[in-house]
Amino acid sequence: MPPGGSGQGGCPRRPPALAGPLPPPPPPPPLPLLLGLLLLLGAAEGARVSSSLSTTHHVHHFHSKHGTVPIAINRMPFLTRSGHAGTTYIFGKGGALITYTWPPNDRPSTRMDRLAVGFSTHQRSAVLVRVDSASGLGDYLQLHIDQGTVGVIFNVGTDDITIDEPNAIVSDGKYHVVRFTRSGGNATLQVDSWPVNERYPAGNFDNERLAIARQRIPYRLGRVVDEWLLDKGRQLTIFNSQAAIKIGGRDQGRPFQGQVSGLYYNGLKVLALAAESDPNVRTEGHLRLVGEGPSVLLSAETTATTLLADMATTIMETTTTMATTTTRRGRSPTMRDSTTQNTDDLLVASAECPSDDEDLEECEPSTGGELILPIITEDSLDPPPVATRSPFVPPPPTFYPFLTGVGATQDTLPPPAARRPSSGGPCQAERDDSDCEEPVEASGFASGEVFDSSLPPTDDEDFYTTFPLVTDRTTLLSPRKPRPNLRTDGATGAPGVLFAPSAPAPNLPAGKMNHRDPLQPLLENPPLGPGVPTAFEPRRPPPLRPGVTSAPGFPRLPTANPTGPGERGPPGAVEVIRESSSTTGMVVGIVAAAALCILILLYAMYKYRNRDEGSYQVDQSRNYISNSAQSNGAVVKEKAPAAPKTPSKAKKNKDKEYYV
């Protein structure tokens, strides 16, 4: 074969490809690494699901109990608090006023304002909220009811700008939510789920460019620029030196009568501040904080019918229906007539008697067959005085089923003042009866989730979603389990636990009942014989009337503490323990998955490195074979000079040998 033909064959094309070690090809993703990532994602997902077990439990509890008990709005965990209506006040017939005053050195000047409030009333003309600037400036913002519709009027230095919603009638006694926003001279207004009503006054087209330019204007010159723009006839945009927020309209001659809930203005929750006796808040007139007045005993049958009919609606609408349409049994005909015929008074679930707003007499309880809602009053039936400051919430009552179902620790049991023997009442004498199941409504702070309505929102959008009616209640149902027989007499029986009396509990405002005051247990009686159990058994608080016990000395309603020291409570605390264990499981799962991924990654790197060395050796062997197999080409030419070296060297050696 000619050399040229051989050179143009397959031989000359191989050496360039196999002349040296090639760079390793990009390796495919190792299978163990992919498996490790999948395991990590699976572990994280499992931990997330386990951490939400309590949420699933609450939702299941909500749906499975809706036929017999009122909705427990605060039964949901912390993440679902966006539906909380906030603090609620009742404004009486005589008119009332809640005033929040900014300190003189802390008065804000805003270019954008947000206002949201929920209310219910039968009035066709009233002023709900008014925000005024410092004296002499004349800026203001007012939310009012005119001819049964909601409107807002504001002035930030140019002219009065009005915006209203004529299609939504709010004087029907139902619960309505109003959302208002202002940006310069522009404004939007929305009532309930009606379309957003927008207002763009004339002369506002230059405000966007002005807003951009105003960022470069020093603050001390802002007022001068505004005055100059006022002379030019342009719309001003800043609400200067806001001095006070007034709720109720009493100072405007158009007092509001009804219910106001969860008022929110630029991050301030004025009603919550009023309930906490904030020094910047002043209250006057016929005003009542929801939770202070007498309660309403709702019939179980009526409540079940109402909830089943409105279960497709939101929690706010369902609670409103329950509050405005339920009637009660076991009352006198006069009170029944006032419930069904009085249209000026508001019936608020768990807060109000269906009587005149100025009548503060306590509701009379009925006997049996009804849901017992908390009566947050003391034993005395005297009407509480009308508060000139923000009213306080008296200590809550003591419910034994609540202590049994939620998880009664020693610091949740009542003081000795409430532990007096009593006879009669359902589920009083025999505690072993598993059919003694009483639905009890109590504060929502007892299920392991702490909520303080005075906390600021996470963002402004939280207060632009839904505003349910009254949510300072949680309905709990005691578990259907055998309970020990507790003796109410002091003669014989198992030793009880008596708590040392503590100082009288101070009056607590609404939303501040999540503190813990531990009480020290003291042995009351020693064991009387070998057959008597030695375990401490809490005595059941005797009732003041059938099914309800009022404990004026009850210190505070604590929250469950899953990580705190002390004795472990009854089975009601399992829910809190499950939340703690789920958090621990999530952490352990994430750590284990991360360690597994690291091990898999190290193993994959080790295998990949070994595979690279083997491929390099194989390349060298192939190069050696290809070089030895070739007899022509460049390789042979390189080795050609080496051939004559051997004879010349041998010749030299021969010469040396010859001469020697």
Swiss-Prot record:
An individual GO BP term: chemical synaptic transmission
Pfam families to which the protein is assigned, alphabetical = Laminin_G_2
In this chain, composition skew of type Gly residues spans: 1-10
Q: What Gene3D superfamilies is this protein classified in?
A: 2.60.120.200
Q: Name one GO molecular function term.
A: metal ion binding
**What is the annotated localization of this protein?**
Presynaptic cell membrane
What superkingdom does the record give?
Answer: Eukaryota
What is the recorded name of this protein? Neurexin-2-beta
